[in-house]
């Protein structure tokens, strides 16, 4: 695949227009002009540079069956932890968010490899084009999705991929937590399949799942040959991981329906609604997702560079965004090359176009489980964000570090219920010995799968029980449970369950041997 051939932009003299174009082998992509969506692609004529331009409405429909997202959660979790502890008001739609980066791995299952006749280059090219459009969609939220790897299950699937979207998603999440995270660091993983999911389901994910080891995953059915359609489904499911729910009638955007509408729309929407903006903002305030804060290292990005997207990628000397938006005195926005005399144009170790001295702190430690990083004096990039070792005591010995966080039951209760919530008394956790629908440690795959009780020593690694002291509640053994996501409300991996012990795979094990 050629470098520097993926672009975002707009049609000249139309500020409301948008465009997402690949120029790798002719022009291919889409643009929106005066409210209409158009496609452009090369005509398949030998020795010809002719292209076809046509409206979305002229595309032959692939089938008439209505298609839907598999996420069923309809309510945002209680706002109390946000309102009471932070005292913040949700900013208005259209606000400028702080830049976030999602490092994405896409897993291509065996059915997809077969669909493309084992042409892995064709699959890669299609993924690059979809991701180019996803990043165009997420520009207003100031989020960049960086592809850091593609995994092909060329010979066989490594999990059981079935038509049950929920079961496959859970299996994929468990595999990510136990296998994929150990192979390559990333923030979010997508499983791309050609298997028909529950009839009309196009995709499914865990709401609020971003950054969580077994929940920062999504499952996408490759239902359409139209790149735009598939990019929209990717953007929609990723929105759920970032705290967005399906839009209701009160949600507005420039051109309804909006991205988080629950059913497939024709043509697909490209704008997030006022509700999505508010929900994403609340998600950032409540969950403070650390994994999406830092930019990826250039060498980790697996997709071709996009000059003008504001992200410094391999093959670029710098990238300050589009020529219209660039305010960087070191960088030529049109070419993504440094201006004469400049040593650097991007990176935390670049100051006034010069590389900072070795030893200069470029990323301070955020908390007990983080460590500070320092410039090397050789590169404008700040070294990869590193954390304290797993098992390091944190929060005054209340917990142990796990993948850069300090998971403790108290904070999990507060996040689930209210700022006044605390951990329930030990007797509540004895309910996890029942192996019931609500109290268990493990279950078989499937909604009706058998539940297995916790062993006596593992009761604090199953369902989390809290004491909710908020107004008029005072519930002594309160739990959180979701029929669509039965892992919700389970004690998080790495949580301290006893002195010197942590929860790993729903078992309370010695912290010295857990990792």
From Swiss-Prot:
Binding of Ca(2+) 2, residues:
306, 309, 311, 313, 316, 319
According to the UniProt record, one GO cellular component term is: plasma membrane
Tell me which cofactor or cofactors this protein depends on.
Answer: Zn(2+)
Q: What is its main location?
A: secreted
- The chain residues annotated with the modification Pyrrolidone carboxylic acid are 95
SUPFAM superfamilies attached here?
Blood coagulation inhibitor (disintegrin) (SSF57552), Metalloproteases ('zincins'), catalytic domain (SSF55486)
Report where it is expressed, by tissue.
Expressed by the venom gland.
Active site location: 237
Protein's cellular compartments: Secreted
Binding residues annotated for Zn(2+), in chain numbering: 236, 240, 246
Q: Which InterPro entries match?
A: ADAM_Cys-rich, Disintegrin_CS, Disintegrin_dom, Disintegrin_dom_sf, MetalloPept_cat_dom_sf, Peptidase_M12B, Reprolysin_adamalysin
| Enzyme Commission number, as recorded | 3.4.24.-
GO molecular function terms listed in the Swiss-Prot or TrEMBL record: metal ion binding; metalloendopeptidase activity; peptidase activator activity; toxin activity
Bound how, and how many: what does the cofactor note say?
Answer: Binds 1 zinc ion per subunit.
Instruction: Cite the PANTHER family for this sequence.
Output: ADAM A DISINTEGRIN AND METALLOPROTEASE DOMAIN, DISINTEGRIN AND METALLOPROTEINASE DOMAIN-CONTAINING PROTEIN 28
The text of the family note is: Belongs to the venom metalloproteinase (M12B) family. P-III subfamily. P-IIIa sub-subfamily.
Q: How does it assemble?
A: Monomer.
Q: What is this protein called?
A: Zinc metalloproteinase-disintegrin-like EoMP06
Source species: Echis ocellatus
Q: Top-down, what is the taxonomic lineage of the species of origin?
A: Eukaryota, Metazoa, Chordata, Craniata, Vertebrata
């Amino acid at each position: 695949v050629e470098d520097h051939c993926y672009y975002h932009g707009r049609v000249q003299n139309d500020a409301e227009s948008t465009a997402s174009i690949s120029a790798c082998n002719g022009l291919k992509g889409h643009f929106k002009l005066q409210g209409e969506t158009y496609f452009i692609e090369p005509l398949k004529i030998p020795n010809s540079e002719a292209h076809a331009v046509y409206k979305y409405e002229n595309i032959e429909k692939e089938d008439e069956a209505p298609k839907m997202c598999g996420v069923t959660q309809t309510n945002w979790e209680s706002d109390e932890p946000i309102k009471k502890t932070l005292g913040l008001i949700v900013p208005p739609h259209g606000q400028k968010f702080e830049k976030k980066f999602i490092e994405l791995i896409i897993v291509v299952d065996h059915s997809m490899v077969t669909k493309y006749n084992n042409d892995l280059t064709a699959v890669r090219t299609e993924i690059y084009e979809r991701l180019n459009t996803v990043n165009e969609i997420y520009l207003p939220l100031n989020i960049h999705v960086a592809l850091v790897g593609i995994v092909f299950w060329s010979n066989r699937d490594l999990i059981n991929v079935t038509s049950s979207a929920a079961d496959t998603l859970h299996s994929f999440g468990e595999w990510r937590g136990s296998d994929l995270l150990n192979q390559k660091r990333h923030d979010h993983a997508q499983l791309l399949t050609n298997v028909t999911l529950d009839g009309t389901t196009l995709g499914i994910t865990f709401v609020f799942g971003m950054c969580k080891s077994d929940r920062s995953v999504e499952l996408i059915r490759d239902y359409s040959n139209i790149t735009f359609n598939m990019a929209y489904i990717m953007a929609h499911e990723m929105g759920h991981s970032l705290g967005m729910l399906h839009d209701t009638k009160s949600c507005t955007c420039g051109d309804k329906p909006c991205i988080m509408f629950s059913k497939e729309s024709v043509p697909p929407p490209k704008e997030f609604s006022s509700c999505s903006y508010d929900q994403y903002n609340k998600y950032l305030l409540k969950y403070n997702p650390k994994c999406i804060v830092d930019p990826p290292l250039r060498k980790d990005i697996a997709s071709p560079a996009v000059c003008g997207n504001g992200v410094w990628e391999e093959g670029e000397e710098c990238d300050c965004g589009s020529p219209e938006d660039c305010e960087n005195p070191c960088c030529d926005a049109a070419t993504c090359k440094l201006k004469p005399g400049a040593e650097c144009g991007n990176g935390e170790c670049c100051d006034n176009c010069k590389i900072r001295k070795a030893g200069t702190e470029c990323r301070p430690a955020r908390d007990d489980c983080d460590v500070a990083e320092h410039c090397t004096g050789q590169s404008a990039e700040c070294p990869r964000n590193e954390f304290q070792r797993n098992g390091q005591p944190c929060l005054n010995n209340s917990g142990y570090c796990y993948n850069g966080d300090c998971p403790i039951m108290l904070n999990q209760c507060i996040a689930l219920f209210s700022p006044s919530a605390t951990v329930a008394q030990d007797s509540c956790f004895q309910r996890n010995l029942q192996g019931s629908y609500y109290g268990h440690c493990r279950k078989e795959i499937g909604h009706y799968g058998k539940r297995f009780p916790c062993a006596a020593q593992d009761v604090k690694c199953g369902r989390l029980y809290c004491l909710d002291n908020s107004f008029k509640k005072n519930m002594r053994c309160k739990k959180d449970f979701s029929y669509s996501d039965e892992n919700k409300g389970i004690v998080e991996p790495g949580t301290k369950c006893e002195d010197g012990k942590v929860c790993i795979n729903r078992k309370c094990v010695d912290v010295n041997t857990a990792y």
